[in-house]
Amino acid sequence: MKLSFVIPCYRSENTIETVVQEIRDTVATRPGTDYEIVLVNDCSPDGVWQVIKKLAAADNRIKGICLAKNFGQHSALMAGYGQATGDYIISLDDDGQTPASESFKLVDKLEEGYDVVYGYYQHSAQHLFRRFGTWVNKKMAEAIIGQPKTLRTTSFFIMRKFIVNEIVRYPNPFAYISGLVFRATKNLGNVEVQHRRRLEGRSGYTLAGLIGLWINGFTAFSVKPLRAATFIGILCALLGFGSGLFVVYKKLMFPEVPVGYTSMLATLLFVGGMIMLLLGLIGEYVGRIYISINQSPQYVVRERTF
C-alpha cells in the first residue's frame, strides 16, 4: 500500500516541517507502508517554498510544486492530486490543525469499503465565526450540491485513486473539491479525529474569501440557484398581482381612502432589489461560462522539485 499526502501550503514556513515530520513518524508505525508527500506552494509571500525545496532535496519521497500565483486552496489541491501516485490520497492542512498522526484512522475506515472518508471533529478548535460558517456551508451543500445529511466534511480526508483520477479530469478554473467528490461517488464515510489549534498564525480565509468559496461551489456544480430564482420570480409576480387586486378592491370599497405611496415605494424597492439580485446570479453563471470558454487555467506551475 502506498499513501500520498497532498498539502497546500500558504504562510506556513514555520509549521510545514513539523507537519512533514509528523507524517513520517506516523507512517513508521505501519511497517511496509510506502508513502510520498506532495507539497504545493500556493504562491505564499513567506519563505515556505525555500523550506519545501530543502525538504525535497533531503528526501526523494517529498515532491514540491510552486504555483505562479495564488490560485486558492482547491486549485492547489488539484495541482497536487495531478502528481499523486499512491493507492490512497490523503489531504490535510499545513498548519498542524489536522492531525496527521491519525491518518491511519482514515485508512482503516476507507478499507471497510468506502471510496472517500472524511475526518470529523467532535470538538472543533475553530473560533465561533468559522464554526458558524462551517454550519452554513453544510446546510447549503446539503440543499444545493447533494451532500448527505449525515456526512461531516473537513479538510482532512482520504480518497481512493480512482476518485482522484476522476477529479483531476475537471478542466475548468472553478475547482471545488467537495462538489467534485459528491458527483463522483455517494460511497462516503466519516471517522472522528482530534481537531487541534494551529501551530502558528491565523486562517488564510477572510469573510470575503469564504463567501467567494461558497459562491464558487454552489454555482459550479448545480443549477438549483437558477431554479430557485425562477420560483422567486413567480412568487414576486403573484405577490404583485395580489397587491394590485387588493389596491383595486380597497379603492372601490373605500374611495375616500387615498392610495398609499409608502406601500407602493416599498413594493417597488423590494421587487427592484430582487430583480438585481437574480440578475447578479444569472450574471455569475454567464461569467463563469465566458471564463471557461476562454480556457482560463485552473493553476499554473512556476517550478517543481522533481
What residue ranges belong to the model's regions?
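Solvent-exposed polar/charged
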Residues: A57, G82, D108, E112, ...
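Acceptor/aglycone-binding surface of glycosyltransferases and processive sugar-polymer synthases
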Residues: K63-K69, Q73-Q83, Y88, Q97-A175, ...
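Short conserved micro-motifs on helix faces and helix-strand junctions that flank
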Residues: P8, L67-K69, L92, F157, ...
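Protein kinase-like catalytic domain
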Residues: R24-V27, V168, N294
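Structured catalytic core of nucleotide-sugar glycosyltransferases
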Residues: M1-Q126
